[in-house]
């Protein structure tokens, strides 16, 4: 995982469905190339293969099921993600929480497959527990701020500061990123100043009238950090 990082979660937004997912991913790729930063896209499972074939930037899955490949109807395995061209996976998002034992199994399996692993957590203490599982990064995301436009870096900066302190002290090999309510380049810059190595966001980019321009705005602080 190359840092600093900007991860754009497409969620299940209609603006990022079908061919629009490819268009958004290509806008992210263009911004990444022009700014020289690492931008990752996380399309819906249905579009993951199509997107991964259409761009050269990293493509992450939004989640995975603990079941391995085989007779598991309607499940998406880590093996499926890898085969479809995914290079990483986001786990335990507040909209798709996992039991601890399942999360531990998924982190270990994903790493064994060579996938980047980002584990989401709602607060500093849970972030520390997530870091103990050995992901490449933890993303602290207070759920009450997700989708509100009230950026964690401005409305709850103490969550970032405490998480960075705890994780860097006990698991320095695990990077800390953040998300929830990130809407602007200033929000991203504030998060980076607080010690994070990147941001995870969704609607700010996906729902923008001009996604390319918005992604450039959001990613520019990363280029200034390098």
From Swiss-Prot:
Its EC number is 5.3.1.1. It is found in: Cytoplasm. SUPFAM superfamilies: Triosephosphate isomerase (TIM) (SSF51351). One of its GO terms (biological process) is glycolytic process. It holds the Pfam family TIM. One of its GO terms (cellular component) is cytosol. The active site is at 93 (electrophile), 141 (proton acceptor). PROSITE patterns: TIM_1, TIM_2. GO terms for molecular function: triose-phosphate isomerase activity. Keywords: Cytoplasm, Gluconeogenesis, Glycolysis, Isomerase. HAMAP family: TIM_A. Belongs to the triosephosphate isomerase family. Involved in the gluconeogenesis. Catalyzes stereospecifically the conversion of dihydroxyacetone phosphate (DHAP) to D-glyceraldehyde-3-phosphate (G3P). This is Triosephosphate isomerase. The lineage of its organism: Archaea, Thermoproteota, Thermoprotei, Thermoproteales, Thermoproteaceae. The gene is tpiA.
